[in-house]
C-alpha cells in the first residue's frame, strides 16, 4: 500500500499533542483521504470532528467516547487496538517536525490519486525496487521533490500527449506582430465590448457579455442562479420592457437571440420568470393570480412580447456533454442564438457514465465538474457564443459569509479549479450582517440606496476591475436590479467608470 507509516504516526500524534494544527486550514489541508488505512482514517475523522465541535484536549477517552456511537467504526478502532495506538503515537510524535511529515503524507496521497487515475508512478516512487542502493537513491530523490514538482511532471506528460495527437484546428502559432494592424483596425471599428448584463455595474466591470467568453455566477441553493440568467436573457432579447418609473413600455434597443438551458426548472417555470421581468410584476402575484387589473394588462402585454422575442428555453433534466452541445448547436443553427445561459454545472447519472466511460476510470464528482467547465469553455469558442453558467457552493461558505471573510473560488462546490476555465467568475450572496455594519458609513452619506445582495467578483480576465464587491438591491420577485455601489474587498468605496454600450 502506498503510504508512509512514519509520516502517518507523526501527523496523527502531533495533532493529538497540539489539536490547534487543525485550525490552520489554510496551511494544512488534511482529509480522511490522506490515510489509506480505514483505521487511520477513522481515527483522524474522530479527532477532526471532536476538535471542530469544541474539544480542546484530544485523548484516548474523548476519542473512544466519540466513536462509541458508530458501531462499525468503533469495531475497527478496537480491532486495531486503538487505545494502545493513541498512547504510542503520542509518545513518538515530535510536533516540531510536523511540517516535514505533513508534506510526506500529502505526497503519498498525491501518488495514490495519480495511481488511481491510471498514471504510471514508478518513475516517482517505485515500491517494487529490491536493491537497497536503488531504494535509497529513489527515496532521496522523492524527498527532494515537492508536490508542485510532482504535479508538473504529470502535467508535462499530458501536454506531450496532447501535442502528439492534437488535430484541432484551434491550435495555431504566429509571429508576434502578424496581423497586428488588422487587429488594431478591428478595435477601432468594433471595440472588444459585449452586450449588457442585467446589472449596469457588472456590465462596466466585465465589458459586457462577450462572445467566446465563459462567465460563472455561483450562489447558494435558492440564491437566484436561474432567475438571474432568465433576467439577463430578457435584458438582451425581449423586444420591449415595462419601465415602472416612466409607467410605460420602452422599446429594447437590443434584439439578440438567447437560450436558457435549465437542468431543473421546467419551461413553464422559466416563462413565469420571464413574464415577471418583462412586466415588472412580481412572479408570486402572477402564479397566485392576485394581480390587479392594471397588472393583468401588463402581464398579458409581457406574454405578447415574449412570443415576439428571440428567447428560447430548453429543459435537460438528465444531461451529458453531448446533449448540451447538441442543444447549443441546434439553437445556434436554427435560432441564430449567440448568448447561452446554462443552469448549472453539476453532476448527473448520465454525465457520470459518459465521463467515466471516456476516461476509462471512475472519476470523482470534483473531477467531473472540472471537465464540464473545460468543455463548456470549449463550446464557447467552437460556436462563437457567450456563455453564462453557475455552480452550487460548498459547505464552508456560510461560516465565511457570517464572519465577513473574502468570498472566492474556494467556496465553489466540487473544485475551485472550475473557475480556472472561466473568463469571469463571481458569487452572489445576500448582504451579511458584517457587510451591513461595514458599509454603514457609506449609507449614512445619503447618496446610495440600501443593498440586499452582494456580487463577489473574484476573477475578471483582461479587465481593470478584479476582486471587487458590487452591492445591489435585487427584487427577487421580478429580478429588476438597482446597483448601489462598488467596493474593494475591505468594503471601501471605489469608483467604477460607467460603460455606455449602444446597440448596433
Curated annotation (Swiss-Prot):
<dbReference type="GO" id="GO:0003678">
    <property type="term" value="F:DNA helicase activity"/>
</dbReference>
<dbReference type="InterPro" id="IPR007694">
    <property type="entry name" value="DNA_helicase_DnaB-like_C"/>
</dbReference>
<dbReference type="InterPro" id="IPR036185">
    <property type="entry name" value="DNA_heli_DnaB-like_N_sf"/>
</dbReference>
<dbReference type="Pfam" id="PF03796">
    <property type="entry name" value="DnaB_C"/>
</dbReference>
<dbReference type="GO" id="GO:0005524">
    <property type="term" value="F:ATP binding"/>
</dbReference>
<dbReference type="InterPro" id="IPR016136">
    <property type="entry name" value="DNA_helicase_N/primase_C"/>
</dbReference>
<protein>
    <recommendedName>
        <fullName>SPbeta prophage-derived uncharacterized protein YorI</fullName>
    </recommendedName>
</protein>
<dbReference type="GO" id="GO:0006260">
    <property type="term" value="P:DNA replication"/>
</dbReference>
<dbReference type="GO" id="GO:0005829">
    <property type="term" value="C:cytosol"/>
</dbReference>
<dbReference type="InterPro" id="IPR027417">
    <property type="entry name" value="P-loop_NTPase"/>
</dbReference>
